[in-house]
Amino acid sequence: MKVIELKDVKKSYGKQEILHGINLDVEEGSIHGLVGRNGCGKTTLIKCITGIYEQDQGQILICGEEVFENPKVKAKVGYVADSNQYFDGYHIDEMIEFYKQMYPTFEEKAFKDYNQSIGLDVSKRIRELSKGQAMSCLLYTSP
């Protein structure tokens, strides 16, 4: 089953076309990497796939449904940027309130148990963690 389908996806910033008719099928259970030189559109493509950006042309489907402005589909997609400055000042335990508001199925006890199992002190700020620890904490809520 195709979980991600891109059909002739194009995206420009002003007059500069960044994505040039991308076509891609990702099958359920497969693993893929996205590599390329700086500025070639990797982050733009990921942000289009996750529905953060809208493509200018083409179609992006997650499990057969359009992703942009589709909360039902976005609830199935998780994304944590390589650098996530938005949450740096938060303590891990403060993230609980944020997660409760953003994710209806968020389980506070499971989140605390998870952080304890990987040795994270929930009183620490995100910026006090290693990059891997911070990503683990932020990825926890990915569907």
Regions found by a protein language model. Give the residues of each.
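Short coil-to-beta microelement around the adenine-binding A-loop and adjacent beta1/P-loop entry
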Residues: 16-17, 71
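The feature captures the beta-strand-to-loop junction immediately N-terminal to the Walker
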Residues: 35-37
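Helix-to-loop junction immediately C-terminal to a conserved catalytic motif
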Residues: 50
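Conserved ABC transporter NBD signature motif
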Residues: 58-73
